[in-house]
């Protein structure tokens, strides 16, 4: 589901979201970004 990475991957304060992107890609999304320290899959 679209927000399955929110709890699994933490988002750093300053734009580092590789963990979020990797999680989203594994879940079948094109990637992910961080919004308010939460991982959102794109």
Swiss-Prot record:
InterPro entries: Ergtoxin, Scorpion_toxin-like_sf. Its main location: secreted. GO terms for molecular function: potassium channel inhibitor activity; toxin activity. Keywords: Disulfide bond, Ion channel impairing toxin, Knottin, Neurotoxin, Potassium channel impairing toxin, Secreted, Toxin, Voltage-gated potassium channel impairing toxin. It is found in: Secreted. Disulfide bonds join 5-23, 11-34, 20-39, 24-41. GO terms for cellular component: extracellular region. Gene3D superfamilies: Knottin, scorpion toxin-like (3.30.30.10). Expressed by the venom gland. SUPFAM superfamilies: Scorpion toxin-like. The presence of a 'disulfide through disulfide knot' structurally defines this protein as a knottin. Blocks Kv11/ERG potassium channels. Belongs to the ergtoxin family. Gamma-KTx 1 subfamily. This is Potassium channel toxin gamma-KTx 1.6. The lineage of its organism: Eukaryota, Metazoa, Ecdysozoa, Arthropoda, Chelicerata.
């Amino acid at each position: 589901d679209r927000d399955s990475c929110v709890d699994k991957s933490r988002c750093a304060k300053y734009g580092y979201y590789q963990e979020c992107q990797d999680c989203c890609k594994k879940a079948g999304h094109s990637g992910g970004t961080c919004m308010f320290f939460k991982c959102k899959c794109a």
